A protein has these predicted regions:
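Gram-negative outer-membrane beta-barrel transporters
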Residues: 442-444, 528-530, 542-623
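C-terminal beta-signal and adjacent terminal beta-strands/loops
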Residues: 613-630, 652, 658-715
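Short, acidic, small-residue-rich periplasmic hinge/interaction motif at the N-terminus
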Residues: 27-30, 37-42, 71-76, 85-130, ...
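Short, acidic Ser/Thr/Gly-rich low-complexity loop/linker segments typical of extracellular
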Residues: 45-56
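Periplasmic N-terminal accessory/gating domains of Gram-negative outer-membrane beta-barrel systems
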Residues: 89, 112-166, 172-208, 219
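Membrane-embedded beta-barrel scaffold of Gram-negative outer-membrane proteins
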Residues: 350-352, 503-549, 554-565
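Predominantly transmembrane beta-strands of Gram-negative outer membrane beta-barrel pores used
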Residues: 167, 200-211, 217-225, 232-277, ...
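Flexible loop and strand-edge segments within Gram-negative outer membrane beta-barrel domains
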Residues: 265-268, 278-282, 300-375
Length: 715
């Protein structure tokens, strides 16, 4: 369900007319219209409305003794007695930004201390409106020039680094493998997060804040909502799914959100049979519960709990064997956060428990992987003054992974009849770290930030110290520069190919520029990073060092009221080092274009056209073979010239259409999408015949169609 609810917030409520109709507009102090502000009557909140793109609203009024309430996140709630205004005249409501005292800010503040140093900050609306997201919080990142994800998955890869160097954090707790429908290599089609629970999502493309550990590339920080504007029930169905989502208020501003989804494949594969020649079956069943409770004015508690049962059946070719690949996975995790607000600070205690069991089989390869994670942290943010904030903390991250495998004796002999051997491996890691981080608003133009994070070695670990420095310069209210650099460490996540925790290191420096003016946004960046450590690509190649230099450009323009145009491009120069020899990196691109054109008219429909283009990835081909009489298979030998071949250029055009219908308290949303309109065969993997004399290619997603509807009730 969560992949397709993106159109729910694309349109506004159509006013319901009655004998007394109050019309008006909601603006901020600068005269800008406020979109999606809540407008309702105090004694009849279920008949409230949401302002449209121009900040306008219409509300039926039957009792002039009632009170009009107008609210929006980040602004003071406005209350207007109806008897004090002429109902028949157009009403102008001006919202003022929150201007609490320091103590009040401490009680209500939710932004992280490093917020001003994030490259991008997204909220729920940004995710839904994002033309590349498909309603997925992590896929929303792919529209950014900093995103270098090339496998059409939700696994975030930032500025040329591998996904295993980037971390996703939910309410201060790291979530490893934050994707579903994942393969043996960790690639996942969609994330496990529902956008309806998200308050804000911060993207640190480089130099992740050292308030968090175990990341050496980038960081995605997700915060769940802390206030529920209204009760809501959603029912959805589509070509491959059915789902329900319920948001319910409880007393004292507490609330609960419950959602469940079921995915099925028969109809989807049947309609897209020509494009789904390898996919035989898939299923997903998940259940999530998010609870937020306020215990007095100073104490709050949030608990997010999630369960998923998923699997797939797909035809796979590897080396000279072709057969079915089967996967099943069950996962359950909980993330809990307790916050206590003192007079001059915020104490946060966080805990996460994550357990999963995954089974995978292909030919003579069988793998059962059981993982356990327990994370605990305590942080205190101290507001020393209005301009200086210090945060310190300690964290412990315990990870355990057991692999019960049947492994091919010969990597190239994968048929069920080929010899294999049993392996039972258990690895664990304890990451105990302490940190300190400060943010100093030097004046109205300069902001300085710095942090240090060190491990406390256990179990014969090596000592390491991470450090960073950031300097932000605000030229004016529209433009800013951010210069940041640092040294970072993280442990790799064990997988089928390498069953160990490997310490990785990264040195980074980046310069980011941002310009915002009315309906125009422009960002640019230049960065350099050197990543060291025995990073595993597959069972054949281990990268010792990877150096990446990149340049990025992003442009967004809204025009003619209903149109929005987005264009981004990236340049990457990447070099990898293997056994002291240098080669071209897999993601060495002279362009990486992402562009979209969106038309959203709440009275008619929403139409979005997206286009992605980049050079093909580099790969290492098989150059020599020897026939092995013992296995009756040819043994391939890869070229010594790593990444000497390249897949064809990647090009993809998608189109999506949606329509919103309003019926009093309910709404109906219908949607459809056509992906890869031109049915372009974008090469994803090179395949060979039995003696490796001929090659052919597996492709990314071909042309597919998808459609469905969502019914929504506000009460």
């Amino acid at each position: 369900m969560k992949n397709y609810i993106l159109i729910i917030l694309l349109f506004i409520s159509i006013p319901a007319f009655s004998q007394s109709l109050l019309k008006g507009v909601v603006e901020d102090s600068n005269g800008n219209p406020v979109f999606a502000a809540n407008v309702y009557l105090k004694n009849n909140p279920q008949k409230g409305f949401v302002t449209d793109f121009d900040g306008k609203f219409s509300l039926s009024v039957n009792n002039k003794t009632d009170t009009l309430i107008v609210s929006f996140i980040g602004y003071n709630t406005t209350k207007i007695p109806l008897h004090s205004i002429p109902i028949t005249e157009f009403l102008k409501v001006v919202l003022k930004e929150n201007s609490q005292t320091l103590a009040e800010v401490i009680i209500t503040a939710q932004d992280p201390i490093s917020e001003k140093f994030s490259v991008v900050k997204l909220n729920k609306l940004n995710i839904y409106f994002n033309p590349f997201s498909q309603g997925d919080p992590l896929k929303a990142i792919t529209s950014l020039p900093a995103s270098t994800t090339t496998d059409e998955s939700a696994n975030p890869s930032l500025r040329g680094s591998s996904a295993d160097r980037t971390r996703v954090v939910l309410n201060n707790v790291p979530i490893y493998n934050p994707v579903r429908n994942s393969q043996i290599n960790g690639i996942g089609n969609f994330s496990i997060f529902n956008p309806e629970i998200i308050h804000k999502q911060y993207v640190y493309a480089s130099n992740p804040p050292l308030t968090y550990g175990n990341t050496s590339a980038g960081l995605i920080e997700i915060e769940t909502i802390n206030d529920l504007p209204s009760n809501q029930l959603q029912l959805s169905t589509s070509l491959a799914s059915a789902g329900v989502f319920l948001s319910q208020k409880i007393k004292n501003k507490s609330f609960i959100q419950v959602f469940g989804n079921s995915q099925f494949s028969d109809a989807f594969i049947g309609i897209n049979k020509a494009s789904m020649t390898r996919l035989n079956d898939f299923y997903t069943r998940d259940l999530g519960v998010n609870f937020h409770g306020n215990i007095g004015k100073r104490l709050s508690f949030n608990s997010f709990n999630y369960f998923i049962d998923e699997g797939y059946n797909v035809n796979v070719e590897a080396f000279s064997y072709s057969g079915k690949s089967l996967s099943e996975k069950i996962r359950i995790f909980t993330v809990n956060s307790l916050k206590y607000h003192t007079d001059n600070g915020v104490l946060s205690i966080n805990n996460g428990i994550d357990n999963s069991l995954k089974k995978f089989s292909f030919g003579d390869l069988v793998s059962d992987n059981k993982t356990n994670q327990v994370f605990t942290s305590a942080d205190y943010r101290w507001f020393l003054s209005e301009n200086f904030t210090l945060q310190s903390g300690i964290s412990h991250d315990y990870q355990r992974s057991r692999f019960n495998d049947s492994i091919p004796v010969y990597y190239y002999a994968l048929s069920p009849e080929s010899p294999n051997y049993h392996s039972d491996t258990t690895v664990f890691n304890n990451i105990l770290e302490a940190y300190s981080y400060f943010n100093w608003n030097m004046n109205n133009k300069w902001i300085l930030s710095s942090g240090m994070r060190s491990n406390i070695p256990v179990n014969d670990q090596s000592f390491y110290l991470s450090s960073q420095l950031g300097l932000k310069y605000r030229m004016n209210k529209n433009q800013s520069f951010l210069l940041s650099g640092g040294k970072y460490h993280n442990y790799s996540t064990p997988n089928f190919y390498v069953k160990e925790f490997t310490l990785l290191t990264s040195y980074q420096v980046a310069l980011d520029y941002s310009f915002e003016y009315k309906k125009t946004s422009l960002t640019a960046a230049a960065y350099y990073k050197s990543e060291k450590g025995d990073q595993i690509i597959n069972s054949f190649f281990h990268i010792d060092n990877q150096r990446t230099f990149g340049i990025e450009l992003f442009y967004e323009q809204s025009f003619r009221k209903y149109f929005k145009f987005i264009f981004s491009n990236s340049f990457l120069n990447q070099i990898v080092e293997i056994n002291k020899s240098q080669f071209k990196g897999e993601k060495d691109y002279n362009y990486f274009i992402k562009t979209s054109l969106n038309y959203s008219n709440p009275k008619t429909f929403s139409l979005t056209l997206t286009y992605l283009a980049r050079p093909g990835n580099y790969y290492t081909p098989v150059t020599i073979t020897n026939f092995d009489n013992q296995t009756d298979f040819f043994q391939p030998q890869f070229s010594n010239n790593i990444n000497s071949s390249q897949y064809n250029a990647y090009n993809r055009i998608d189109i999506s259409l949606s329509r919103y219908f309003k019926f009093d308290k309910t709404a109906l949303i219908v949607f459809a999408s056509l992906n890869n309109i031109l049915n372009t065969k974008n090469e994803s993997e090179v395949l060979y015949n039995s003696d490796y004399t001929e090659t052919h290619f597996d492709n990314y997603q071909l042309r597919t169609i998808y459609f469905g509807l969502v019914w929504q009730l506000n009460y």
